[in-house]
Design a protein with these regions (language model features):
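A short glycine-rich, Lys/Arg-flanked "PGG" loop and its adjoining helix->strand segment in the class I
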Residues: 129-144
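Conserved class I S-adenosyl-L-methionine
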Residues: 1-46, 59-63, 87, 144-176
Length: 245
């Protein structure tokens, strides 16, 4: 039976912000890597309409709102959205929230968004190409789509094994990657870097940035840290800009 990621995240949230992203003052892209303050992929978001796909616990959405954005969040897990609402109220910012699949954006008009962001959520989506088409539809001409996702090379490893660098599966195996998170079973859809790039191009995005961030070399480690982070990229970070209509 396929894993129900939405139900799992409803249980994981436990009424509090969840996920892999720390902090609420700056946009973060993944565990134990630098964030927007270093990568500078978004530009100024002040007075911009910004849509986050898979807003999770709301840390990035609140950070965007604090910087003056009209922050719009979409998530498939109602319990996560409830946690986002509480976090936004606590921080004294306003956010707009929607519940539904990340591949469906009926609440957004065409050419109405200045920026779309997604951090570690697109792996849960089965039809990634539909997400790309929907994002292209709602973005303004030339506007950026910035997203991070689990790096497909890291999917090959079992980082809880005695030998975490032992390859456990083929890079070309498209079956979902199943794993445990806070006691719940989750799954990510595995795609190669080439497939992600080709999907963006078919959806009429011009890709100008692909990053495989190295982990932070100093400072505290998150609870998600694994030693293989030092040798195999954990996160794939991409920016594309809308071209055409």
């Amino acid at each position: 039976m396929p894993i129900d990621n939405a139900a799992a995240w409803n249980r994981i949230s436990g009424g509090e912000p969840g996920g892999v992203l720390p902090g609420i003052d700056s946009v973060q892209y993944g565990p134990d890597i630098a964030g927007e303050s270093e990568f500078r992929l978004l530009g100024s978001v002040e007075r911009k309409r910004v849509l986050e796909l898979g807003c999770g616990g709301g840390q990035n959405l609140v950070a965007l709102a604090k910087q003056g954005a009209h922050a719009i969040g979409l998530d498939f897990a109602p319990a996560q959205l409830a946690a986002v609402k509480r976090l936004a109220e606590k921080e004294g910012v306003r956010v707009e929230l929607h519940q539904g699949p990340l591949s469906e954006l009926p609440f957004m008009r065409a050419d109405s968004v200045d920026l779309v962001l997604s951090a570690y959520a697109l792996g849960f989506v089965e039809d990634l190409n539909r997400v790309f088409r929907q994002v292209h539809r709602v973005l303004k001409e030339g506007a950026p789509f910035v997203f991070s996702m689990p790096h497909p090379a890291y999917d090959l490893l079992d980082d809880d094994a005695d030998d975490p660098l032992l390859i456990r599966r083929s890079y070309f195996d498209r079956s979902p990657v199943e794993y445990a998170w806070d006691g719940q079973e989750l799954s990510d859809h595995h795609r190669t870097v080439a497939e992600v790039f080709a999907g963006l191009c078919r959806a009429k995005f011009r890709v100008d940035t692909i990053l495989e961030p190295e982990p932070r070399v100093d400072g505290p480690r998150s609870r998600h840290w694994r030693e293989p982070f030092r040798m195999v990229p954990r996160t794939l970070l991409v920016r594309g800009r809308k071209e055409g209509s």
